[in-house]
Amino acid sequence: MFDSSIERVTLELCFHITLSIMCGCSIYFLLLVFILTFYSSVLLHLKLYFFSSDRAIFNA
């Protein structure tokens, strides 16, 4: 009886730890995707801005 309750508590603890790690990893992954998307869009806007300013300089 005592051993089975310890085993059950250990299994529940492992399950909760695994679940929290999975949730943390998914949140971290979503944050990473958001940061990469934001960074690439900013980079794209900067590149377009510099190319358009270069074109304006060359045309003038």
From Swiss-Prot:
Main location: membrane
GO annotations of cellular component type: endoplasmic reticulum; membrane
Spans through the membrane: 19-39
Record's keyword terms, sorted: Membrane, Transmembrane, Transmembrane helix
Membrane topology category: Single-pass membrane protein
Subcellular location field: Membrane
Highest taxon listed in the record's lineage: Eukaryota
Protein name: Uncharacterized protein YGL041C-B
Naturally occurring in which organism (per UniProt): Saccharomyces cerevisiae (strain ATCC 204508 / S288c)
Taxonomic classification: Eukaryota, Fungi, Dikarya, Ascomycota, Saccharomycotina
